[in-house]
Amino acid sequence: MEAKAEGFCSFLVGLSGAPVNSKELKSALEKGDMKARASALEALIRMHLNGEPQNHMIMTVIKFITPLDDHYIKKLVLYFWEVVDKTDASGKLLSEMILICSFLREDLLHPNEYIRGLALRFMCKVKERELVEPLVSSVVQNLTHRVTYVRRNAVLAVHRIFKRFPELLPDAAELVEKFISEENDVSASRNAFEMLVECSPDRVVKFLAELRESKNLESLGATLQMSIVDFAGHMIRANPYDKGRYVTVLFSILQSNNPAVRYQCASTLLSISTSPTAIRQAALTFIDLLKTHTDISVRLIVVDQLDAMRERFSKILQDSLLDILSVLANGTMEIRKRIVTLGVELVSNQNSEVFVQAIKKELYWVKNECDVDDKESLLEYKKLLIRATRTAVARRPHMASAVIPLVLEYLYEEDDSGFEVVSLIREVLQLQPSLRSETLRQLRQTLRMIRCPSVIRTVLWLLGTHVTSADDALEVIRLLINTLEPLPLEPTVKEQMKQQEDFDGHKGGQQKPRMQMTTIVQEDGTYVMSSVPSNKTQEDAEGNDSNCGLRGVLTGGKFFIAAPLASTLSKLIIRLFNHHSSGVDESTMKEAQNSAIMLLNEVLRFCTMDGAAGMIDDATHEQIRLALLNITNPRSPLLATFVEDSSKALDSLTNKVGSIAGGDGFDFNKRNNDNVVGRTSFDEQQVALCSVDTPVMFTQIMEGKGSLLELEAVDDLGSVVANASIEKTEEFLIKLEKTVPLSGFCDPLYCEASVTVHQFDITVDWYIANCTANVLRDVSIELTPLGSMKLCERPQVHTIQPHGSVRIRTALKVGSPETGVICASVLYEGPQNERGCVVLNNVRVDIMNYVRPAKCSASEFRDKWCKYDWENAVAIRTEKTDMREYVEYVMQGTNTRLLEPYPEEDDEVVSAFDGKGDNGHRYVSCNMYARTLFGDDALLNVSIERDAEGKLSGMVRVRANKRPVAYGFGEKLNILNRRIVS
């Protein structure tokens, strides 16, 4: 069957009950009551739509049904005239159809406005000139009818008639222009406006100018305003030099009361103008919608729009940061998270104080919020706030003094919030020497109450690294001793009870009650000591035990904390003896030295005793022994030089490769620059860098693509057109690269396909060319998708002329991001009605088509790495020798992004990274991150080293929250490795 034959069947309507013959229908139409005649008309319409022509019933309908005044009958009659064939095989109008003109004229001038409206809507669908011509005057008369329903449909009828037969209504534009200037109904005005837009744009421009002068644009109806916005955007794209005429119109419509109109108007301004005023107005409109609208989906869409604006107009949005953050007061948890994430990207010198104040307010809200059911979401939001505070402090250092007292109270918590806070404090101590003294004092005050082992470890390292004065060093030593008192160290009550239970269980006896010594007064007044069973619970006993903070962590069996404790004590004692010996009494230094030795000996004894909660590892044991040795001989010049050089090395590392370690979005290289703005886009940074020997381009004397790009850079009016042209060319080239040939030119049919992946479906564009000199009929594609893909609908059947071609598009639903295969073949019918088949190559849908590079901070990466269970490890053994080249090869092959970018400027760091420098670095470890279109995460860790032969080997580990993602990435990595070998 040819494709043209299917064009006549628009839809199929099911018939219920027994089939009806023509005699019964004719009898019902002639002699039945209103209900019977209506049922007969409905049956006629259904039968004709389903492929049973009913032209032989036209005269019966004209004679017996058309004169009736029943409204429902009138409606069905018009439906019948719409679907019935009104022309013969040669295309001439049937003689019977001339008879309905008088009835249509009566309906167009009927006293009842409903019937008039039905007739006018029918006139919109008539395509026969002979029927339309005698009714034009009747249609035009309805433009001045008193009822808006009639006028609304009359404008539509005039529009359709003028579009099909402009010679029948040459003054249609003038009539509609007069109509729209006098019309008060919004829908009728909108229909008239759409007609003028299509038929006479100049009159639309005149109409808009009159509206702009009368200042009535903001008071128009929402539907008409939406049409005006679409027209303005279309005209500006067609002729950018008239932009000023329409931007003022859009500014007026921005004051509309309808949120949909305001959103569309703001989006149009963003797409057609780069003026700061227009962008600022669009941003303020989005922010106002974010504040006033209650629908969650709409607010999320607006936040996404603002985030898209940030990539191009970051500096303009920075001025509106206060308005954006005000949405936090009445937002849901998801809205709050997105607003904070957006606000972090907009922090600058001018607005960082506003941002920090908003974060303070939100932290207080999180602390006092008890009614939230989703505690996990609240915890994630708290971590996000603290991470945002870190970013703000890194970009506005002088705000740290106000922020640190606020976040210090979160050091006490055992979740990840404490680690985020101590990371912030670490950066402040390293980058802002003026705040070290006060910050270290606050740390010393809070050390006793910290319970998280990782936080305690970092705090100890900070105290050992940044405490330099003699008084502070002595105070820290006393603090550490007091924190671990009372001595000697003993296991916690919980550990003692556990050991007792294990011992009693091993003996098989019943557990003895806990005994307590008490004093009893006898009858003669004497005092005696007696042991009685204790009724205290385990919790009470633990509450009385000194197991808080550092002591509790150490006695609880986490012996790794002893290593940073020993390192801190040794650093403090070495500094005390080498740099402050002249200002401190010898007895005081000796006392501090003895106290440190005594404390470490006690820690070492406790960690190696038989009743300890666990076993100390060899590395920690060795570090404690080494610290004792260093404290015993603290005046060694080697130790003093080592401590000082380690501090200098830390400063040097921060200055050189701070940008590499800035996975959380910090730029340490710019910490002293007063012009630091928030994290700008990569394009902006590239524009700022310009070599002194770059040639100057003169637009007037250049040709080709270079001149176009220069015009794009300096000419604001042509930027939209130039960008659109370049983007379309790039999209075409990308699509061309994805096109895969599936058959050869020697086959009767040549076929090629390109796959486009969307979020939940796949679109395959097929190109089929007839390589023969014969007409091939019934050409169709048979598809068999494998995997999670399902075919939405069967492809249509086509007829291809000799050496002709056809394009077919098919859609497949996708359930999960995994590699799939589409098996296909092309069936056709030759000139002698013989059936043929061309088996095509398989179309592979790679999992990488679903993957997009994404951003992720280092802390988020660690959290996800610990949380996700699905892991796939791929061993590496390659002939490549360049580490950076291999990392980039993996990154491009897996569509991932490095968490920590390469250093580009420092040759020493680069050579260290590549392992070609004198320092002999021969290994690389880096993390990569990506997200699928389904929202699934993919985390990669690449660890490689260079062996003695110069070849690279190592491991790539993949973790994901879904099994298909981890499996697919592992398969892709194996393919990449095989390509290198081959």
From Swiss-Prot:
Subunit structure: Oligomeric complex that consists of at least the alpha, beta, beta', gamma, delta, epsilon and zeta subunits.
SUPFAM superfamilies, sorted: ARM repeat
Pfam families the record matches: Adaptin_N, Coatamer_beta_C, Coatomer_b_Cpla
HEAT repeats: 16-53, 130-167, 241-278, 317-352
Organism listed in the record: Trypanosoma brucei brucei
Role according to the record: The coatomer is a cytosolic protein complex that binds to dilysine motifs and reversibly associates with Golgi non-clathrin-coated vesicles, which further mediate biosynthetic protein transport from the ER, via the Golgi up to the trans Golgi network. Coatomer complex is required for budding from Golgi membranes, and is essential for the retrograde Golgi-to-ER transport of dilysine-tagged proteins.
Name the UniProt record assigns to this protein: Coatomer subunit beta
Keyword Protein transport part of the UniProt annotation: yes
Example of a GO MF term: structural molecule activity
GO biological process: endoplasmic reticulum to Golgi vesicle-mediated transport; intra-Golgi vesicle-mediated transport; intracellular protein transport
InterPro entries xref list: ARM-like, ARM-type_fold, Clathrin/coatomer_adapt-like_N, Coatomer_bsu_C, COPB1, COPB1_appendage_platform_dom
GO-annotated cellular components: COPI vesicle coat; Golgi membrane
Record's bilayer topology term: Peripheral membrane protein
